[in-house]
Amino acid sequence: MQLIPAIDLKDGRCVRLRQGRMDDETVFSDDPVAMAGRWVAAGTRRLHLVDLNGAVAGKPVNAEIIHRIATRYPDLRIQVGGGIRDLDTIRGYREAGVDDLIIGTQAVRRPEFVTEACQAFPGHIIVGLDARDGRVATDGWEQVSEVRAVDLARRFEAAGVNAIVFTDIGRDGMMKGVNIEATRELARAITIPVIASGGVSSLEDVRALCAAAGDGISGAIVGRALYEGSLDLAEAQGLADELCGVKP
């Protein structure tokens, strides 16, 4: 069970939103590269970067900062989402040292693009399913489709997707706990590993996620709880390793 710190980028700064609302942000740092260093020093094995401006614009906006983080920490596994709409964007990030690219909006609009990306970059493609009341949202969460997250996830079973990041928008940034029921339901419905996102805020959430690891939940993205200090990364990862039987 990997706990993955999130760095959300908006206008060049590290921010956290509430329920994905671009007008409800808290700025935690003007130096995202230094923030990445903070999580590296805390022992993280992986980092989740989101270009919030890019998610709305449909193309990379904060790519230069992401490139700097990837260059500064070449041994860190980095996954990036936000504005990933074509193969050239994926190629640019891969050449910059980014490990995994998260396809969200295009997974809804052009599911075949996910297959194309997996064929071009095998082992490096993640699908991001961001759901509000079970329905997948797109365009930086500004639009909610009629597509059910579980139904869309099943379409990618044979595509070669590395993982699915499942975000419960209603929990994101609200510090109300992870929606373990919905995440577990999705994980049980597919064979692709699921990374939970949205609401992880306490050691109790970590325990609940570890209890569901056998259902296919392989990790969890953590944001506001780390920034506000309600969750200590080293302590939480240590607990996850202990509960999941990982040796130090």
Swiss-Prot record:
Phylogenetic lineage: Bacteria, Pseudomonadati, Pseudomonadota, Gammaproteobacteria, Chromatiales
Record-listed E.C. numbers: 5.3.1.16
Cell compartment(s), UniProt: Cytoplasm
Catalytic center residues: 8, 130
Pathway annotation: Amino-acid biosynthesis; L-histidine biosynthesis; L-histidine from 5-phospho-alpha-D-ribose 1-diphosphate: step 4/9
Family: Belongs to the HisA/HisF family.
Stored PANTHER family: 1-(5-PHOSPHORIBOSYL)-5-[(5-PHOSPHORIBOSYLAMINO)METHYLIDENEAMINO] IMIDAZOLE-4-CARBOXAMIDE ISOMERASE (PTHR43090:SF2)
GO MF term list: 1-(5-phosphoribosyl)-5-[(5-phosphoribosylamino)methylideneamino]imidazole-4-carboxamide isomerase activity
InterPro entries on file: Aldolase_TIM (IPR013785), His_biosynth (IPR006062), HisA_bact_arch (IPR006063), Isoase_HisA-like (IPR044524), Isoase_HisA-like_bact (IPR023016), RibuloseP-bd_barrel (IPR011060)
Catalytic activity: 1-(5-phospho-beta-D-ribosyl)-5-[(5-phospho-beta-D-ribosylamino)methylideneamino]imidazole-4-carboxamide = 5-[(5-phospho-1-deoxy-D-ribulos-1-ylimino)methylamino]-1-(5-phospho-beta-D-ribosyl)imidazole-4-carboxamide
Keyword Transmembrane helix in record: no
Primary location recorded for the protein, binned into one broad class: cytoplasm
Keywords: Amino-acid biosynthesis, Cytoplasm, Histidine biosynthesis, Isomerase
BP GO terms, sorted: L-histidine biosynthetic process; L-tryptophan biosynthetic process
Source organism, top-level taxon: Bacteria
EC class: isomerase
Protein name: 1-(5-phosphoribosyl)-5-[(5-phosphoribosylamino)methylideneamino] imidazole-4-carboxamide isomerase
Gene: hisA
Entry-linked HAMAP family: HisA
Record field: transmembrane: none
Cellular compartments per GO CC: cytoplasm
